Each structure stands twice: as structure tokens, then as C-alpha cells.
């Protein structure tokens, strides 16, 4: 009844403006529930996808910290004044953090004191280095960009080294690893340069101390990935110092008893 009256007396633009203002007020009462926040702001992280429950599990301990949160892909494509649902959601969920958004389209209308917008490509190393150089090391990076396998891998190779120590890197919509149109494959589940082939390969590095490979040279990922969590279409990668030793192996050789 109320919705019908509002639509009767207000233009679509006014309805949209009213909804945005009231959603912010309603969101304050649901600040600790990402599923509700996603629905309030219209983010596809709950409903179209089922990511909010996993984000809550990993992010809840960080909720009241002061952080730099960087999300690639703002949404709305080239439609004017469209997109930004998840940026608003993160700004509410992390009340002490600054939320940074990257998109190839102009999304400057979303800029606020706590939401910062940058226009450029996620595959442009100079652009990404410039953004991080300006804002400092992100504590959380979320890749919700083009989802093309090549772009996802290029972005990770550029940004993971720039992620803060003990930071979290998230890749959404990993189903494109199986889609040929996006550079993936369902026939070869170990296709070279498939994004999940790459991320699965990094799991062995968690146990580099156990390799029986004398002279083995550690990669950056061996040294700095401390855990990985795989969900339906979603991967979390934790950064830290992966320097736990083995109880049997020394310098990649078995220690004789």
C-alpha cells in the first residue's frame, strides 16, 4: 500500500533517491548481518550468489578495524548513476574503514568521504600500482571485475604482492574457469592459465617445507600465502609469513634419524 502511494506521487528518479536514503537508515540496524545488507543495498552477493555467508565468516573479526578495502568492479556497467551496491554495503559493514572501488566506467557519482572511486582497467599494472601507491596497502582486496581468466590472473599477480601483511585477497565468480568464452575450460580442468588451475596450484606451496627437492627455490607465493579457502565460485587467499618448518624435512631433504 505504502509503496503504491509512493510510486503514485513521486517520479522514478525521486523514488530511487528516497530508496537510497532510507536504505542507508535501515542498514544501520542490520550492520552485523551481511545477508540483510546485501539485500537492502541490492548487491548480488546474496540472492544471485551466496557469498555473504562466507564473507561474514571471514570478515566478522575485522569489522571494527580501520582498514583499506579495495573492490574491483563496481557494477552498473555504462549505465549512468548505476552500480555501487556492494561499496555501500562494505561502507556500512566496516564503519571505520575506507572503501575503494575500481571500474572501467565513470562511477564518480558514488564518491563520499569514505567511498573513493578510481577509473581504469584491472589489467593495467601502471594504473593499479598508482592506485595502491596513493591509498597505501589494502587490507582486503576483492576481485569482482571482468571475471575473464586472463584479467583475474593478471590482477592477482599485480596486487597480491601489494596486499598488506595479514591481508585477505578474494576472487569472486570463479565459475568462469570452466567457461571457454571467458578463457576457461570444462573439458580440461587443469587448462593452463585457467584461474582455478592457477589457484589450485598454489595450494602445494602451503607445504613447501615438506618438499623433497634439494635446492628448491621458494616462490613469492610459497613464502606469503598461509591459507586458502575454496567455496562455490569463491576463493579466499590469506597473506602472511609461511615459514613453519617441518618435523622431518630440512632444506628440502629428509632428516635421517
Regions found by a protein language model. Give the residues of each.
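A short alpha-helical cap/connector motif
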Residues: 1-142, 146-171, 175-257
Amino acid at each position: 500500500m505504502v509503496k503504491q502511494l509512493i510510486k503514485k506521487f513521486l517520479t522514478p528518479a525521486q523514488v530511487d533517491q528516497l530508496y537510497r536514503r532510507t536504505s542507508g537508515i535501515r542498514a544501520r540496524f542490520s550492520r552485523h548481518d551481511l545477508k540483510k545488507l546485501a539485500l537492502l543495498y541490492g548487491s548480488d552477493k546474496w540472492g544471485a550468489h551466496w557469498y555473504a555467508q562466507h564473507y561474514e565468516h571471514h570478515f566478522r573479526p575485522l569489522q571494527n578495524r580501520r582498514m583499506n578495502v579495495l573492490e574491483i568492479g563496481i557494477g552498473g556497467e555504462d549505465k549512468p548513476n548505476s552500480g555501487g551496491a556492494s561499496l555501500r554495503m562494505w561502507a556500512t559493514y566496516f564503519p571505520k574503514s575506507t572503501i575503494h572501488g575500481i571500474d572501467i566506467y565513470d562511477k564518480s557519482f558514488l564518491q563520499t568521504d569514505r567511498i573513493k572511486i578510481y577509473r581504469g582497467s584491472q589489467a593495467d599494472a601502471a594504473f593499479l600500482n598508482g592506485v595502491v601507491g596513493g591509498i597505501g596497502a589494502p587490507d582486503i582486496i576483492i576481485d569482482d571485475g571482468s571475471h575473464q581468466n586472463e584479467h583475474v590472473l593478471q590482477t592477482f599477480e599485480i596486487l597480491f604482492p601489494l596486499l598488506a601483511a595479514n591481508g585477505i585477497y578474494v576472487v569472486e565468480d570463479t565459475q568462469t574457469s570452466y567457461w571457454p568464452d571467458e578463457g576457461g575450460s570444462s573439458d580440461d580442468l587443469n587448462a593452463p592459465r585457467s584461474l582455478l588451475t592457477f589457484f589450485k596450484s598454489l595450494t602445494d606451496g602451503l607445504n613447501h617445507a615438506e618438499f623433497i627437492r634439494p635446492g628448491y627455490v621458494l616462490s613469492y607465493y610459497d613464502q606469503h600465502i598461509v591459507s586458502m579457502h575454496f567455496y562455490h565460485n569463491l576463493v579466499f587467499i590469506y597473506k602472511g609469513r609461511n615459514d613453519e618448518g617441518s618435523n622431518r624435512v630440512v632444506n628440502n631433504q629428509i632428516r635421517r634419524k
